[in-house]
């Protein structure tokens, strides 16, 4: 198992980043790839969790150990896999998540992608009281870019699709942001807040 990787960030896609270390390029699934935009071609430290399957060995990466801890707690819940946990981490509202779990706010938890009533109830059952204090912000707000607005919105929509949101939901998000000029990372953060409001 890996704890973290330190290497050069060489590539960003809608779903993952690539970090080169000792001549190898590691594909690392992250909650919001565009939050790493300012770190391209720079030395980065990414905290890791490895998932081993019959057909693949997958790496999931995080800005901080707090973010990784939230992810690990989420995947300990029956019915929540790594992709769903990553989508929850991407919302970057740890305080809201912890409050919803501790206060049995099933409706709030069901706003996350792929979380139905049964899984939300299981989250409360398994995780209530497990967060001693709300984890710090995960670092998705760090990156900034000056690329053109439409390209950035396209990248944001692609990243949201990778997190499990439906095209129908994202059509409304695209219409809402059409004509604005933000970074992909900013679009993702704003879109996630809108999606959580319903």
Curated annotation (Swiss-Prot):
Record bears the keyword Phosphoprotein: no
Q: Does the keyword DNA repair apply?
A: yes
Q: Name one GO biological process term.
A: DNA repair
InterPro entries the UniProt entry points to? DNA_helicase_Holl-junc_RuvA_I, Hlx-hairpin-Hlx_DNA-bd_motif, NA-bd_OB-fold, RuvA, RuvA_2-like, RuvA_C, RuvA_C_sf
Pfam families registered for this protein in UniProt: HHH_5, RuvA_C, RuvA_N
Q: Where is this region: Flexible linker?
A: 143-147
Question: Where in the cell does this protein reside?
Answer: Cytoplasm
Region (Domain II), start-end ranges: 64-142
State a single Gene Ontology molecular function. Answer: four-way junction DNA binding
The alphabetical list of record keywords is: Cytoplasm, DNA damage, DNA recombination, DNA repair, DNA-binding
> Which residue stretches belong to region Domain III?
148-198
Q: Which SMART domains match?
A: HhH1
State the residue spans of region: Domain I. 1-63
Q: Which SUPFAM superfamilies match?
A: DNA helicase RuvA subunit, C-terminal domain, Nucleic acid-binding proteins, RuvA domain 2-like
What Gene Ontology cellular-component terms does the record carry?
Answer: cytoplasm; Holliday junction helicase complex; Holliday junction resolvase complex
User: Know anything about its domains from the record?
Assistant: Has three domains with a flexible linker between the domains II and III and assumes an 'L' shape. Domain III is highly mobile and contacts RuvB.
Q: How does it assemble?
A: Homotetramer. Forms an RuvA(8)-RuvB(12)-Holliday junction (HJ) complex. HJ DNA is sandwiched between 2 RuvA tetramers; dsDNA enters through RuvA and exits via RuvB. An RuvB hexamer assembles on each DNA strand where it exits the tetramer. Each RuvB hexamer is contacted by two RuvA subunits (via domain III) on 2 adjacent RuvB subunits; this complex drives branch migration. In the full resolvosome a probable DNA-RuvA(4)-RuvB(12)-RuvC(2) complex forms which resolves the HJ.
**Family membership noted in the UniProt record:** Belongs to the RuvA family.
Describe the task this protein carries out: The RuvA-RuvB-RuvC complex processes Holliday junction (HJ) DNA during genetic recombination and DNA repair, while the RuvA-RuvB complex plays an important role in the rescue of blocked DNA replication forks via replication fork reversal (RFR). RuvA specifically binds to HJ cruciform DNA, conferring on it an open structure. The RuvB hexamer acts as an ATP-dependent pump, pulling dsDNA into and through the RuvAB complex. HJ branch migration allows RuvC to scan DNA until it finds its consensus sequence, where it cleaves and resolves the cruciform DNA.
Name of the protein in its database record = Holliday junction branch migration complex subunit RuvA
């Amino acid at each position: 198992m890996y704890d973290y990787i330190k290497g050069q960030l060489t590539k960003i896609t809608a779903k993952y980043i690539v970090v080169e270390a000792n001549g190898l390029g590691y594909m690392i699934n992250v909650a919001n790839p565009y939050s790493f935009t300012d770190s391209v071609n720079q030395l980065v430290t990414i905290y890791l969790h490895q998932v081993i399957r019959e057909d693949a060995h997958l790496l999931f990466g995080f800005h901080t150990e707090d973010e990784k801890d939230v992810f690990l707690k989420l995947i300990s819940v029956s019915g929540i896999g790594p992709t769903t946990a990553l989508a929850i981490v991407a919302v970057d509202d740890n305080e809201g998540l912890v409050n919803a779990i501790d206060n049995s706010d099933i409706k709030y938890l069901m706003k996350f992608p792929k979380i139905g009533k049964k899984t939300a109830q299981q989250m409360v059952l398994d995780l209530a009281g497990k967060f001693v204090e709300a984890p710090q912000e995960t670092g998705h707000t760090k990156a900034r870019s000056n690329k053109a607005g439409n390209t950035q919105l396209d990248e944001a929509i692609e990243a949201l699709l990778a997190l499990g949101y439906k095209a129908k939901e994202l059509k409304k998000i695209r219409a809402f942001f059409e004509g604005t000029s933000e970074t992909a990372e900013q679009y993702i953060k704003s879109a996630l807040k809108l999606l959580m409001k319903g």
